[in-house]
Amino acid sequence: CAKGNYKLQPNGIEVGVSEVWRIPTDSTAIFDGKQREVCKEKVTTHGDFYILDRGTYEVRVGVKVKIPANCVGLCLPRSTINRLGIIKSETALWDSGYEGFGTQTIHVPIKQFKIHKDENWFQLIFISNESPSELLYEGHWQNEAPKRPFP
């Protein structure tokens, strides 16, 4: 279900991130029903750390996820993120058949958040369907991937 750098836990899979972007305070997600991308500023690491100032960010998980026909997937924050006061927006459901390096949104309400680039930020959980889904995800975000390989 996950391929890449991860840590298996009793009830999920811990994952890090491969890319981080700052979402501007003014943004347009959909225009004329066609535009899907928001102009965002890519955040680079400072040495071995991401340093995120107060604001909202989109982060790409650092593993390729493949949701089987008999499951749905969720991506939740690790307790470390919660304890630091970082707010993760509610996750979108990863449908049966989704495959790719999904993204999540976090909000940094504190002055600054510093985290090692190899730290695991999220935990993926998979929930079994009552029966395998006959309809599999084939949407716009299928096979989304980082611009560069995750180490």
Task: List where the protein language model places each region.
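DUTPase catalytic domain/fold
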Residues: 1-151
